[in-house]
Amino acid sequence: EDGLTHKLRNICQEYPDQQIMEYIAVYSLEELFHAKLLPIQYGSIPGRGQLAGKRKIERILRRKFTGRLDVVKCDIHKAYPSVTVECVMNLLKRDIGKNKVLIWYLGALMENYPGEHLCIGGYLPSWLFNYVMSYVLRYLLSLSQSRRGVQTKMVKAIVCYADDFTVYGYFSQLTKALKKATRWSKSTLGLDVKPAWQ
């Protein structure tokens, strides 16, 4: 049981040899993670973390935007269990498909995951979750609407910590953007985005 939220979590305790293999995998994927993870992601990434995320939120609220701004706090429902090995492998094949040996190695490592989804508590799964999450965030940031021939971004800013993220913008645009992102992430990645209007 989680001490803060009192949620029951299925934590995975990996064997030492699995942990070593996962460290090798993360090292091998460094270039991919450097290219794909966004600067707005703060969870389980060295040099970032909660304090850096908090400072980013403060900068957004104090300096970046003048006038009124609406904020939606969102999270991914059952985040790690929602990310299947199949989903991760499809994205990896798309991005590093030419590296057959690395694809084989990652597939073999993830065969050990119970339930065929990412495990809470593993080193590689935390990086892979951020990798999958970057697709959701990138999709949200790409949304725009055209009015009188002028394109405007529907989402002004995002700050993400693991599966929790805050989205900044104007209420009407955020409503549309989150509906689109919820549909897209469910159909494409199998993730269920839960917005909580505050």
List PLM regions with ranges.
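Generic structural motif
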Residues: 2-3, 16, 32, 77-79, ...
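Conserved polymerase palm-domain catalytic core
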Residues: 59-196
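Hydrophobic side chains in beta-strands
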Residues: 1-2, 27, 167
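Short, conserved non-catalytic motifs in the polymerase core
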Residues: 1-20, 36-49, 109-131
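Active-site-proximal segment of RNA-dependent polymerases
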Residues: 22, 26-84
